[in-house]
Amino acid sequence: MIPTATYRLQFRNGMTFDRAAALVPYLKNLGISHLYASPIFTATKASTHGYDVTDANEIEPSIGGREGFERLVAELKAQGLGLIIDIVPNHMASSLENAWWRDVLEYGKESRYARHFDIDWSRRLTLPFLGDTFDAVLENGEIAIKPDPATGKPTFAYYDNYYPLAPATWQGREAEILALTDKAAIADLHERQPWKLMSWRDAARSLSYRRFFEVTGLVGMRVEDKTVFDDTHRLILELVRTGAVDGLRIDHIDGLADPKAYLARLRQEVGPACYITVEKILAKGEQLPDDWPVSGTTGYEFIASLAEVLVDDEQIDNLRQAYETVKGAPVDMRAELRAAKLLMVDRNFEGEFTRLLALALSIASELQIAQEESVVRQALRELLIAFPVYRTYGTAEGLPPTDICLLHRIVERVKTLENPPQPEALTFLSRLLTGDVPTSSLEEATQFRVRFQQLTGPLMAKSVEDTLFFRQNMGLALNEVGAEPVTHHFSIERFHHEMKTRQARQPDALSGTSTHDTKRGEDARARLYTLTEAPEQWSECLARWRQMNQTHVKFLNDGTAPKSADTWMLYQALTGVWPPMLQPQDETGLNALKTRFEAFVEKALREAKLRTDWVDSNEAYETAMLDYARYLLAPDNQTFLQDFYRSLQPFIRAGLVNSLTQTVIKLTAPGVPDIYQGSEALNFSLVDPDNRREPDFATLAQQLDQLTPGVFSREESWLNGQVNQYVTAALLRLRQQNHELFRFGDYIPLRAVGQRADKVIGYARVNHDDALIVVAPRLVFAECDGLLSQSHSGFWAGTDIIIPGQLNQHRYRNVLTQERLMPGEHLSLASHQGGVLVLMSD
């Protein structure tokens, strides 16, 4: 069954199955068809998110276990709702809490699970979980031989972690081994294990297993193997087959060796009715492979499409110039992207790169192709850096035609570099990727292609989302998952084109605007888009605020903290997160915001990897930056806070109009709207873990019961999220009543004419005799005050929407006000206050 709307709920951190069951009546009242659950399987004890699974065949006891899960399912069914769960086939926790992983540590290659994990068994399994080298930790007395508290067997004990010994190294000598205190003897015993403990700092270059991105605590799984697939999906398939679960969200599909084969097997097992979406980041213009048996993506590309509507393309260059002035240098985003990718290849993914290079050189040697290591290294490095998408989708048979064309374009681009690799090396690597090798080398070439494809995705993600987007902060709203790293022009025409394509290619994909992975909540993003409408006003505010807080800038050995560019980021981030109703004299509210903002600042600085990072933190710089950030929100900093609050008001108001437009589009454009917990009202969250905070569900439920069309006339209702919640509920119910229109209806752009034609977006959805007309304001920063109270009809004087022939013969009902009208050929916006119209044909 295809959902009409999903609601993402984050379990753990206090959210249990029973608490979720209590929310089901609210979700039904809101108009949700499917609850969309974060991972529910047993994960590490300290897990806050559930992606670090330790047992894929057990439901997490701490959130209610199997019994609690069944109570939730029963309540969902009683209310007529379905359930989608988030599954994680790519990885599990490399934790001693994981029985499979523990078995591998104990028995090494002989473990029945040795091939479940993606481990390089040509060497000892590396365990990068020490605070220093093994020798240093041993010398400091941090490691000792102790019995496992659970089994009594001898282990290497490192604080509360007990690493099991291979039976052959202690059986028959248990008392002797447990009595070991001599450091040399302990070191010798360590050398005889199938694993080797090492410093966490050495993971990037020495890891012997595939990990999720840079997270050594998450080990890759070989689900391409049928046994592994069966073992990791046993409970998942049971839940689908028994009807408890109606849909699956596949986490990080690009991490798998063969996504197409995995999805084909999964589809075969769950049947045609199961709703399947994949977490897949698409570049602009990129499409999901046609032969994947899924309904679509989880919707990051939809966020990028919305920017086409809400960014002022005519003024964004002025914002860029202002940023470069503050920064003190022009920004070349292509060069910045290259620098970020180089850092990832050379440092953060050094081990993965080295392994790939060694494999290429081994194949060259087998084929007796003369290739110098330095030459192949340069060619491989440049190919990885030049990749414009997350990955290709080659199989044992080679690359599909579209990916061959992509690879050809990349190679040609690499050849134009100022210092290009040798053509022969590029040709050799291309042959490996396309499978153009003798039969004797096909297996190794396939292995190379798989490893290459599994590296380009993490490389892109960590370079763009988790480095570049924290370094270059011209417009934080544009630094989002799925956004283009290189500047482009924004236009409604492109948005319309992308929606037509979406309707044609993945009409059942999720359309998300906030997730647990987005860099900020959808309404923070909507507010920050308005900076592109008023770059001069923003720049004047910034200069004034910097001057007000100048005395808290520190002078360090490596420069000032914050630098000018840092302040641009800090004030813009604070602009996005500031709660609409927070008053500058509200000490409790300021302190709550300060706690959240501090955590964001620390993460932003480390992700940028400029003056500090996760590997080597710069304590002096971080302290100075955090002190500055704290001072911004100090209750006694009233001169600044009052000015900040006052200056923010037009951005807040324009942002709320953007929020409404964004909501209306999400709920009426092609795709299945996904509501992230609490975002049916307003979501001004920062990057995780801030975006996983639980919303006030009691208030949301109470508020929903009281909402009427009158919310539009009350400014407070805009500020507290009632307007968005009212519109969300009204349109979700409309979707339930007109499922086929929203699923199959054509997407038809509508043309605006008149004085404010560039300030509005319009389109229609048409399916047989059913029609929907959607009109929403955009780029109204300069005159948005009246829009919040819907009293500014003069703003729209002389602005009409042209209604084409097949639509202008209908009578319509305004879904948001219940007014009935017959628009004719020209729909006058002046007679419909506020500029937001959702008209459903009678």
What is each of the regions a protein language model found here?
Residues 1-45, 53, 57, 62, ...:
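Carbohydrate-interacting/catalytic domains
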Residues 50-52, 94-107, 263-265, 291-293:
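Short low-complexity, flexible loop/linker segments enriched in glycine and/or proline
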Residues 72-119:
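Hydrophobic or amphipathic alpha-helical targeting/insertion segments
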Residues 82, 247, 275:
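Hydrophobic "anchor" residues on beta-strands that sit immediately upstream
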Residues 90, 250-256, 716:
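Conserved short loop/turn motifs at secondary-structure junctions
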Residues 119, 123-201:
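DnaQ-like (DEDDh/DEDDy) 3′-5′ exonuclease domain used for proofreading
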